[in-house]
Amino acid sequence: APTRRRGRAKENCEHLRIMSPTGDTAVLTPDRWKTENADSGTDRRADVEAKQRRIAALLQEAGCEGLLVVEPENFAWLTSGGAARGVPDASELPALYFTADQRWVIASNVDAQRLFDEELNGLGFQLKEWPWHWGREQLVADLCHNRKMISDRPFNSHKVVADQLRGLRRLLTPYEQACFQVLGPLVSHALEATCRTMNAEITEREVAAQLSHRLLHRGAQPICIEVAADGRSRRYRQCGYTSLPVRRYCVMTLTARKYGLYATSSRAVCFGAPDPAFKKEHDAACKISATYIASTWPDAMPRQILAAGQHTYRLTGFEHEWRLCPQGHITGRLPVEMNLLPSTEQLFQANWGITWHASVGAAFSTDTFLISEEGPRLVTPPEAWPLKRIKVQGAEFFRPDLLLR
């Protein structure tokens, strides 16, 4: 079995209840939120400077003068949470240019002022601005002319280092972990408050609207919303939402973005006594997710963890259900940084974000965690929610149960 450090798993199960730091703010950018001790590695400017040093090392290794960054996920990573909101044309998105000791934002005259006022103030970036009628490519070509460059996507003769950047950004820094622990409870709150207050007979679409409102009200952005009424998710595991009314029960899964990071969670509510078939599916999904969580340690191999999950699927009487939906993925600056497949052998690393998504019939058991040396730390903790106690090889885990109304 892939479970590590069995003797320590029970004591570290408290990490499944970690709550967010205080001091959250209802803005999308993290520069106005800091923990009390800015010297602990959670200060945003210090985080950007640390990434500058990583880029300097990458440039030295590649023997190049500069790095061009165009992909939005890398923009968010290297600015520690910056975002180009309100830019519908991907070719007009801002870019970044790094040398070993300096950094620039490449932006249009339409967006430059807002970026520096609301996203990047005080972070040490300089500006290279293009008139909106020029387009980004002309300025980038001029800036990189006769320079030996690396970039995160193919451009002229640049060496592409997308894989190297992906590996670097998956390792969440202390600042990013602090931001992660603010985002997660916002996702949990949106799901649980909606389950507690929604009425029967409202449509899946109205449920999705409530989830969106609760996120946006607190400065988080809904990315993916799935609402399944009365077993619709048995037919469609990635179900979106429709005009179907909720009569007996509802399962909802929510992915949100804040500080350029992503977290996902699910909850389910029943009106009246739960449908016996659905309750059996939900109980099985909770056991399977607990199996995954118990093995979420640094150096664990996804292939082995998924094999253990398949064994639990068989034990619960749902042998083939794992084939119908992805079971988990690494998350961070993209909603899905890497899907976990039965063939995946890349070992987990400490400070990766991970989402486990067990699905059985109409039921989902989904949450996001931080992989740490002390065990899996729950990023999307329940607030005031019924919990199901599950033992895995002697260790106890708590999974969100059905809310009965």
Where are the model-predicted features located?
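Active-site neighborhoods and metal-handling regions in enzymes and metal-associated proteins
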Residues: 10-405
